[in-house]
A protein has these predicted regions:
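Extracellular/periplasmic catalytic domains that process cell-envelope and extracellular macromolecules
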Residues: 80-82, 107-110, 116-119, 136, ...
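Second-shell loop/turn segments in exported
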Residues: 36-42, 65-68, 112-113, 127-133, ...
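Extracytoplasmic ligand-binding site segments that recognize negatively charged/polar headgroups
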Residues: 122-126, 132-220
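Periplasmic-binding protein-like
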Residues: 137-160, 323-347
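Bacterial N-terminal signal peptides that target proteins for export
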Residues: 1-11
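N-terminal segment of the mature folded domain
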Residues: 28-159, 223-225, 236-242
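Flexible, solvent-exposed loop/hinge segments that line or gate ligand/substrate-binding clefts
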Residues: 94, 200-328, 335-359
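C-terminal motif of bacterial Sec signal peptides marking the signal peptidase cleavage site
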Residues: 17-22
């Protein structure tokens, strides 16, 4: 696939075309459908899913080209606001205040935006400690590690929850995102909701400098830093956890490992946000739920588009691509490539009506 064109917002210095996934089944279609090129940008957590979606959509629409730049959630939102991309991917939705204040260049003023939680995935707490593959940790301990209140792997707070694990006398290196990140916002949202006595910085996209730790750019940078370090721990979209050790988090009286099913379960018990438009399906995650089998460290990544575009050029491709992404075929393709959880039938019905109305 050719490299994406430069957007009108200066944050895009260099774009990266996605390598198409070979494992996605072709959707039904004869390949003679829509044509034209559209540009999207945003969350690096969606990269594997976007590869699957692009391949599946283009197999049915061979004259269409989808160019996606995984520059991060904040960059994607800024690029969409400025008109450098016709859709954005973000690990957090725009706030109600941002929607009211921003002038979305590509959108007809007053028509609002569409936000679909199209990618649901657990955030894995990953670590690299020799001889240890899995740990049980409660929220307060996780927060203590990332605020550096707990800085040794054999600290009693960790050891007491893992009595059968041989923990080393080794310093903990906590790795966080250096860039503005929706993954960070979701991870800190979990800490803020479940361990506010330890994590008092709130749900934020930019890591607080006072907590220190090692910084790394984007999802791949965090995974590389944890993989290549010693005694490291970090957080990343679960599709990128690989062979690293992972944490089961305490929910009620049980420790729950990450899984697509557990991520979907927490979304099902969570409401939509208040004060939003009819095509804005932002979810307020109930991270301190004690329901059995839910995994609260979850990332809901959104696809964001205009309800009505200023330019009618390529609107059919935009609508068609989003229709494929949320379809059962598209969601299955993402699940196969990225380990994400398919959206629920209720959300599919609501989102489908909104996407069909794009003009």
């Amino acid at each position: 696939m050719k490299l994406p064109r430069l957007g009108t917002v200066s944050i895009i210095a260099l774009t990266t075309a996605l390598t198409l996934s070979a494992c996605v089944p072709a959707p039904v279609g004869d390949g003679t459908g829509l044509s034209g090129t559209i540009i999207g940008a945003g969350a690096s957590s969606q990269q594997a899913a976007q590869e699957a979606w692009v391949r599946g959509f283009q197999l049915a629409n061979v004259q269409a080209t989808i160019e996606y730049d995984p520059i991060g959630s904040g960059g994607g939102r800024d690029t969409f606001i400025g008109g450098g991309a016709v859709f954005a991917a973000s690990d957090r939705a725009f706030s109600v205040e941002e929607i009211a204040e921003e002038d979305f260049v590509s959108c007809v003023p007053g028509t609002g935006i569409l936000e679909i939680p199209a990618y649901i995935s657990p955030i894995a707490i990953i670590f690299n400690v020799e001889g240890v593959d899995a740990l049980n940790l409660d929220a307060a301990t996780i927060a203590g590690i990332f605020t550096r209140e707990i800085d040794q792997w054999d600290d009693a707070a960790i050891a007491d929850q893992n009595p059968t694990v041989d923990l080393p006398d080794q310093r903990i290196t906590a790795v966080h995102r250096a860039d503005d990140s929706g993954t960070t916002a979701n991870f800190t949202g979990y800490l803020s909701d479940t361990a506010p006595q330890v994590w008092d910085a709130g749900a934020i996209e930019k890591w607080p400098l006072e907590f220190g730790g090692e910084a790394a750019l984007q999802t791949s940078g965090v995974v590389d830093a944890v993989t290549n370090g010693t005694g490291t721990i970090g957080y990343a979209d679960a599709s990128r956890a690989g062979q690293l050790g992972t944490v089961s988090v305490k929910v009620g009286d049980e420790y729950v490992p990450y899984s697509p099913e557990a991520a979907a379960a927490i979304v099902d018990v969570s409401p939509f946000g208040e004060g939003r438009g009819p095509t804005d399906f932002a979810v307020e995650i109930d991270r301190d739920s004690t329901e059995a089998g839910v995994y609260p460290v979850v990332l809901i990544s959104y696809l964001i588009a205009c309800n009505e575009y200023v330019s009618k050029d390529r609107v059919d491709v935009i609508r068609g691509y989003l229709e494929y992404v949320i379809s059962p075929e598209g969601q299955q393709a993402a699940a196969a490539s990225a380990g994400s959880a398919p959206i629920s039938p209720r959300l599919f019905d609501q989102a489908s009506a909104a996407v069909a109305a794009i003009r």
